[in-house]
């Protein structure tokens, strides 16, 4: 079987230019020195780095932990406030009138720029409104808003008074919303009359009403932001529902709210993520360690400079939006672009228009978006300038080498380093990444660990793989890091069982990885996405990377399905680029490519031409659904309303039924 790294990387190393290195926030030499210190003397390293934040009171101990039993405390006894670190610290400096949030609406004619002082003023006022409705330190506030500035203002206002925010992505169904309300038991809900996505209205207030009707929890207060202005279809309950703008315009409302002094280990937010059991997990993050992780990674990974305009395309409903649209940028005094729309509206040049409109210097997006835009060709890109860009980033899933090369050549014009970042909702901040002026990149590799992070590969018996050279295993983290989650909200047992029980003494990420001869890490996909073919473990990401090497293929998703002889067979869903005709010749080409790049053991048993893939609105492929369809199970697919395009599922089922007949 050929070296499987051939699938994940073209054999080349891309080093930063001399100019980029000269001006970078860190050199390779300094990275190695600081990384060594962060592992060998974490107390000294993190005590020094924690001074990046403003503390009302210093901690009594940097770190205490019983890691194998999932018990970790950072900066215990230290007092700070997140909104103070994101806003107050800047308004007595020249940053007061610097753009903090640059908002671009779904409709290209709509935009707003809020300075640090603007955001500070709005956050203080809304914090006082929350207090007026009885929200106290430790209470939960559920936030179900579109990507508008009021979303950032709301979560910062929660942090100001010590309330725990739980943002639910605006694309989730009333049922999904209800399950989160039942779990976190919020004192108050903040929503909007509706929103816009791709030129189409989306229901928000109506979904909240439906969720509250079915919920066991009796939420007494719903604050509604006016976004669409369409009140005709709204159901309004006096004494429960209140307009945001009406409350904010109250002349008696105080313009200042004293920030609550929070212990470093006080809860900051709950963010729900999918669990293997189907019930969403409320990932709980705390104040000090999380903010330090977001702050420090943002500074080094994105090589941020005072004059930069930075754009993370993620929705705040996901952890990437929390850490790298709000908390990381604002605690560093950066200008952060916030985008309500989608990359394809009003046309496939929208991302590039926004970059040119605001002179974006740093652009952070997902491989799914990159591949979708690759499919549209170069016409939209050639009409744009894009010369303001100096750094590109990728997040959410491994980026296949073809997409990496396209991104580097066509968007970065061959001059912008790409930081391919690996991390999770649970980790809070970036864990494995290139530092752009220090670490040479390899297309498809997340590269090396960030400070304080000890990634290890563990075999199925729980033994750490220490061999030099190229090895594969289960990706685990050895030892605590500041921004790690502290628990599953309301379910401490589940926290230990999910992350610490499988490999004793390690945090198990759920991902498989390969470490090459240079120590670079290559994420090979979820371990539950590994297909066991005749006793051979085949990573779905490896087969997918081989399939998308073909110039006709836009995207591929590979899952296992029951096979009478092999135990599991390989089922490949393949989406082709526009204008490409699907036929047996192309099918044979794809099978041949997989055989050539991995081996005959990895050849797909089925190639299913797919009009699209079922994805969440954040771009995550729902492999659970694909596995069921591949196995001929068309019932019990779960709530598909959260998908970006639910109709894709029905089309895939119809195609599969034709195969059977």
From Swiss-Prot:
Organism per entry: Leptospira interrogans serogroup Icterohaemorrhagiae serovar copenhageni (strain Fiocruz L1-130)
Family membership: Belongs to the ATP-dependent AMP-binding enzyme family.
Protein residues bound to Mg(2+): 548, 553
Superkingdom to which the source organism belongs: Bacteria
Description of post-translational modifications: Acetylated. Deacetylation by the SIR2-homolog deacetylase activates the enzyme.
UniProt-listed Enzyme Commission number(s): 6.2.1.1
Alphabetized UniProt keyword annotations: Acetylation, ATP-binding, Ligase, Magnesium, Metal-binding, Nucleotide-binding
Protein name, UniProt field: Acetyl-coenzyme A synthetase
Gene (name only): acsA
Cofactor(s) required, per the database record: Mg(2+)
CC terms in the record's Gene Ontology section: cytosol
Binding site for ATP: 396-398, 420-425, 511, 526, 537
């Amino acid at each position: 079987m050929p070296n499987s790294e051939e699938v994940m990387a073209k054999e080349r190393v891309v080093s930063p230019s001399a100019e980029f290195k000269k001006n970078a926030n860190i050199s390779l030499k300094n990275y190695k020195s600081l990384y060594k210190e962060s592992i060998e003397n974490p107390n000294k390293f993190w005590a020094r780095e924690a001074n990046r934040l403003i503390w009302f009171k210093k901690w009594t101990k940097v770190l205490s932990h019983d890691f194998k039993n999932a018990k970790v405390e950072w900066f215990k006894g230290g007092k700070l406030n997140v909104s103070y670190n994101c806003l107050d610290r800047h308004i007595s400096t020249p940053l007061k009138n610097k753009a903090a949030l640059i908002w671009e609406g779904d409709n290209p004619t709509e935009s707003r720029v809020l300075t640090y002082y603007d955001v500070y003023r709005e956050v203080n006022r809304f914090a006082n409104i929350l207090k007026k409705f009885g929200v106290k330190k430790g209470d939960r506030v559920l936030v179900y808003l579109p990507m508008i500035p009021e979303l950032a203002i709301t979560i910062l206002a929660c942090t100001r008074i010590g309330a725990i925010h739980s943002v639910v992505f605006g694309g989730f169904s009333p049922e999904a919303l209800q399950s989160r309300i039942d779990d976190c038991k919020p004192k108050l809900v903040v929503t909007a009359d509706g929103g816009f996505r791709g030129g189409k209205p989306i229901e928000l207030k109506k979904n909240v009403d439906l969720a509250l009707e079915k919920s066991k929890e009796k939420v007494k207060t719903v604050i509604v932001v006016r976004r669409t202005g369409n009140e005709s279809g709204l159901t309004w309950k006096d004494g429960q529902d209140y307009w945001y703008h009406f409350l904010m315009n109250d002349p008696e409302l105080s313009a200042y709210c004293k920030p609550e002094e929070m212990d470093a280990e006080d809860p900051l937010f709950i963010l729900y993520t999918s669990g293997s059991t189907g019930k969403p997990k409320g990932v709980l993050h705390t104040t000090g360690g999380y903010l330090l992780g977001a702050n420090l990674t943002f500074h080094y990974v994105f090589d941020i400079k005072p004059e930069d305009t930075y754009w993370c395309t993620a929705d705040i409903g996901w952890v990437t939006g929390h850490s790298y649209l709000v908390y990381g940028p604002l605690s560093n005094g950066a200008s952060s672009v916030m985008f309500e729309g989608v990359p394809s509206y009003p046309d496939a040049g929208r991302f590039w228009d926004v970059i040119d409109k605001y002179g974006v210097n740093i652009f952070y997006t997902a491989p799914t978006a990159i591949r979708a835009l690759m499919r549209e060709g170069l016409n939209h890109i050639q009409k744009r300038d894009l010369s303001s860009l100096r750094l590109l980033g990728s997040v959410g899933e491994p980026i296949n080498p073809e997409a990496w090369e396209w991104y580097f050549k066509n968007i970065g014009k061959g001059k912008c380093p790409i930081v391919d970042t690996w991390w999770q909702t649970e980790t809070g901040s970036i864990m494995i990444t290139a530092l752009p002026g220090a670490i040479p990149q390899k297309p498809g590799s997340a590269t090396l660990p960030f400070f304080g992070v000890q990634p290890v590969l563990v075999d199925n018996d729980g033994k750490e793989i220490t061999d030099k050279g190229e090895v594969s295993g289960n990706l685990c983290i050895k030892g605590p890091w500041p921004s790690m989650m502290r628990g599953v909200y309301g379910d401490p047992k589940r926290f230990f069982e999910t992350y610490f029980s499988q490999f004793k003494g390690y945090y198990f990420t759920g991902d498989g990885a390969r470490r090459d001869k240079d120590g670079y890490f290559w994420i090979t996909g979820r371990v539950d996405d590994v297909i066991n073919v005749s006793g051979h473990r085949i990573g779905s990401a490896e087969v997918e990377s081989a399939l998308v090497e073909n110039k006709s293929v836009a995207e591929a998703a590979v899952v296992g399905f029951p096979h009478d002889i092999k135990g599991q067979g390989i089922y490949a869903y393949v989406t082709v680029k526009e204008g490409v005709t699907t036929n047996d010749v192309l099918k044979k080409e794809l099978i041949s490519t997989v055989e050539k790049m991995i081996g005959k053991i990895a050849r797909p048993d089925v190639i299913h031409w797919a009009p699209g893939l079922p994805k969440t609105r954040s771009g995550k492929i729902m492999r659970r659904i694909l596995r069921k369809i591949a196995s001929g199970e068309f019932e019990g697919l779960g709530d598909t309303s959260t998908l970006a395009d639910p109709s894709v599922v029905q089309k895939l089922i119809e195609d599969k039924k034709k195969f059977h007949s």
